[in-house]
């Protein structure tokens, strides 16, 4: 009889023990964060209770206790056995019950108060803001998306990551995770990642939508938004993906059924469809750009076939491309009209992120470093059917030398792989692969179903602010009342809101305008949002950075 091997059992036992240790470590982190939240909440409550006991002054408004209550509630969620958090929460119940707002009845005849188009960072964040903070009826706020929740993030190249860092700082500071779309949540805590992948961030958004009990309808594409003369909108939608197949099958079986296209009626519309799924058109960049491949269509840089690539565009998308190609030991040449690796500004939206600069420095030290050519502007791409018998020729022209300003102590990357040329001289670059087009996105506003419902800035502004949709002070279309914009396409006074931590601060501005239009009292909600740094209506604080000495 052959003795039974115990090696497999030992491996299983070891794996189980490792998993148990990991689970316990995760639980301990949760308990530690819960304790920190309780201490922070108690420190907020203490002066308020002193004010209650002081008969010479008015009692604080119930809304002032809400932030502490949110912390105690979050602590209980992290550690259900935290009796101190439960005790502190019970002390506040009577105060908070007085604050429970009364929801006014609908002041219009539309079935929906708000339709939010897009279930990404902006759409989910605004859904939470409208229903949780401004007390709109969740059943009357509908979020639609032609894909899944977080669809654009699911389409990111597998190696692409957030350039803004996540860190769970809320329990210890007045700020919170830069990539969070709702106060009291943190992608860093949920995902255990500082620079999340697209798939990870989509998971965060899905879980947030579930926890917030948002009314989300996926695989539903908006084909038209039609303003009504007396206010409100008719929104035409069609099913996509599996929903479309099911609808078509049902329609084929029953000719008397409703057509595949359906219409929604809503008092307000928030356009939050983003940019990633709407790259610059194939003919809008330069002659021959239709021969190129946009970086947003790359599923994974590791599985991209071929070698010796030409990357057109040197901002974040282009730098992400060359960093990944270098990591895969693939030769590549980057062509950019601006040497963004030399640009230093007081706005994080107009210079490369520190995370990107670190990656470029690493790429330049790789075994196959990229060539960086700037200032060099591509004016044409052609197929090459002669000398190389296939492939592509990228024609570009050198621009005038630029003296980029930077701080006295700024650390610059090495010039070893950076190349310049004589102004006006033309060069040809050959590549056997379709050139990679990394020149940004046209965006859903300019190319989607609402492009006729916005006015645009006619080229005013620089960078992302050029040709931006024109908005009033509430991020409402200047052309179509009741239609609001949320997300990275928002801009004001030449300032762009392309990072999550920027555009999330406009959620409450939009929600406040809509809630007031629906007859809600919003003063307490606005105060709460200001306390959370989620109500940005003064842009003077956005126009300068610390620089080298604060």
Which stretches of residues belong to each language-model region?
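FAD-binding core/adjacent interface of flavoenzyme oxidoreductases
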Residues: 110-111, 136, 207-305, 414-425, ...
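Glycine-rich dinucleotide-binding loop and its adjacent helix/turn
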Residues: 197-200, 271-328, 334, 458-473
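Glycine-rich active-site loop/strand segments that organize a redox cofactor
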Residues: 139, 146-203, 335-362, 366-369
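A Rossmann-like FAD-binding core segment of flavoenzymes
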Residues: 224, 241-245, 260, 264, ...
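N-terminal Rossmann-like FAD-binding beta1-loop-alpha1 element of flavoenzymes
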Residues: 110-142, 310-326
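FAD-site-proximal beta/loop scaffold in flavoenzymes
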Residues: 289-303, 423, 430-432, 437-497
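C-terminal, flexible cofactor-proximal segment of oxidoreductases
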Residues: 442, 460-550
